Curated annotation (Swiss-Prot):
Gene: mutS
Protein name, UniProt field: DNA mismatch repair protein MutS
Superkingdom classification of source: Bacteria
Record-linked CDD domains: ABC_MutS1
Xref: Pfam families: MutS_I, MutS_II, MutS_III, MutS_IV, MutS_V
Family, as annotated: Belongs to the DNA mismatch repair MutS family.
Single biological process term from Gene Ontology: mismatch repair
Molecular function terms from GO: ATP binding; ATP-dependent DNA damage sensor activity; damaged DNA binding; mismatched DNA binding
Residues that bind ATP: G613, P614, N615, M616, G617, G618, K619, S620
UniProt xrefs under HAMAP family: MutS
SMART domains recorded: MUTSac, MUTSd
Amino acid sequence: MKAEQQHTPMMQQYLRLKAENPDILLFYRMGDFYELFYDDAKKASQLLDISLTKRGASAGEPIPMAGVPFHAVEGYLAKLVQLGESVAICEQVGDPATSKGPVERKVVRIVTPGTVTDEALLSERLDNLIAAIYHHNGKFGYATLDVTSGRFQLVEPQSEEAMAAELQRTSPRELLFPEDFEPVHLMTGRNGNRRRPVWEFELETAKQQLNQQFGTKDLVGFGVENAMLGLCAAGCLIQYVKDTQRTALPHIRALTYDRQDDSVILDAATRRNLELTQNLAGGSDNTLAAVLDRCATPMGSRMLKRWIHQPMRCITTREHRLDAIAELKEQALFSDIHPVVKQIGDIERILARLALRSARPRDLARLRHAMQQLPELAQTLSSLGNSHLKSLATAAAPMDDVCELLERAIKENPPVVIRDGGVIAEGYSADLDEWRDLADGATGYLEKLEEEERDRHGIDTLKVGYNNVHGFYIQVSRGQSHLVPPHYVRRQTLKNAERYIIPELKEHEDKVLNSKSKALAIEKQLWEELFDLLLPHLARLQELAAAVAQLDVLQNLAERADTLDYCRPNLTKDPVVHITAGRHPVVEQVTSDPFIANPIELNSQRKMLIITGPNMGGKSTYMRQTALIALMAHIGSYVPAESATIGSIDRIFTRIGASDDLASGRSTFMVEMTETANILHNATANSLVLMDEIGRGTSTYDGLSLAWASAHWLATQIGAMTLFATHYFELTELPNQLPHLANVHLDAVEHGDSIAFMHAVQEGAASKSYGLAVAGLAGVPKTVIKNARQKLSQLELLSAEGSQPKARTVDIANQLSLIPEPSEVEQALASIDPDDLTPRQALEALYRLKKML
């Protein structure tokens, strides 16, 4: 006997469905619950903190079981999706009344972290991306898809560093990778990684899948036909999404090539250090996005974050945005646009659910409400003169046909789901209205029947009622049940009453129930037909949503510029960063003290600033604010300064702060050096580089040597615009030795045992570091500070005398190297081939080697 045949028919059905979905949790509908069995039950009980019970037996052992109520399933799904789990939803599709054996069930949808579209499972102000990654010969193909909007992009990073930066930028909720993927360390620490068969990434299969999706013969029109690695990833991705959604994907209409040359490249360390959308603790407070995002709609908020993470190099695009912001700011139109756009809401995600035919009645009611706001938006935008805003206003023009259809079709306040009807408005369908009238007319008939029966038999407690179990009934109190005539048939006995049925009432019940079920069937059919009527408008609706989202971002940036006193940056192609009275956009909002604004000047004659000054003096803030102002200028935003001229930047690098990477076995110093190596290899003359405290993780001489050499290389070989903060005062000599360098410092003033930080940037090098004063502020015991001052005096005296402490002599030139470099003699010996030498040449070589010793 097969193992499956040892189970009940219901469990046999479960095992067949589970075999089709072996790697994900299966929610198996049984009545009012979704049940899980075996290992799924054990896993779900731990993840969801629900009870683990038992049911029946398998091979003599009870079957583990856990369940969740169907009406509360969204909350449990949300928790599982947040944990990176995927769930197959199995529903009863057969009719229990006509089924022989178990009710027919099938998996109707698969919920995965990257493909969810339900509002309850999504963060409304964050993109929800699914991605696929492919690797070949050291290069990568990477595709991302936002199922909730239809945005489908691919990119081809040329190195692991670039690939890591893309993963950091996009933060996919789900990541597909082939079974033979080698650089698996890229996925360390990520939830939602999915291993897929290698054949799903085959190029020809991918092209076939994509052409089928877009209804095209080739991909030339999308400009991606030569992106072979990216297409391999995109093909796997579209197939996976089709498999999980179990439906067509009409809202995914194009695949775009995200060319990295078009944007300012930010590596993973830079995104982390600048705290763009996530702070160093992993939260969203005190980030650039937290300050800039006052968007009226979630879709506007998501677009703004995409802009922040992908600054544009194209000056024309940025000038268009700045021109639009200028007009909205000067005319204070943002205050008029904000409330109207807020009423439009997040139609982008509603349209995705419409495309997937998973939209609910209230989705379409919200879409109707959004359509009703468009005439007012058009009126508000009618006075605009800016060409970019005019084009957005045209794209967001009213769609009267869609609005009229939704107004006719959907009730004012529809229920949450279509299941029980009551969604389609009166007057939309004469057929539906007729059956509804028949069902609703029952109320008057029942009231009349109740009154007649009560008068006819003299039973004043007689009532006509209805429940789902027994249908219609006549109820009489126990005290008057003796008055009931013989043709009353008892249906139910209660504690204080009896319930009866009569032929006339039974006949009416059959008629009413039939009319209700008929009306519900017609309503569900009309609901499906409504999708068919709306889908031809999908492309136009998506364009409208994108235009409204961009209007929202622009009005938001105009409001921020006005409220926070930002200025319009002057954009130029020259490598220059000239800022007057610049401020850190985040720090100035969270500090209780007045923020000290500072200038900066970087240009072709002043490429590097050596920044010195005390800890807590503001060096890191000064560096970060420069990078953030440059980044804001590259998204087309106003900036926190009195004035700013920002040149075209190709990359922003930061080497600020570090911590041990314990998972990879890398020390603080190793992390620091890895980031430094990345900068020295990839920076160009058009890059903005922030280097903070290079070399602090090792000995003084090692650190000083590395800091000096790094600064020297950046200045002489690369010529990048560089802010180089250091505690090594020896580096302040560099501007005296090399052109295009300058010293600046942040100062402090000591008052006895206290210290006041000025936070003002001044020309020249700092005179001292104030390290002991900072230690005192931190609470280091005064005795320790006193001993430190004595030791400092001794060291300064020895340094002035030109000697080293006798306790330990450091031979700088002969430090132990992890990879010993060959001596001059060894190099000379290695270059000699004895078999090719005459006796005379051999003797001459020996004398040369002797001289080298």
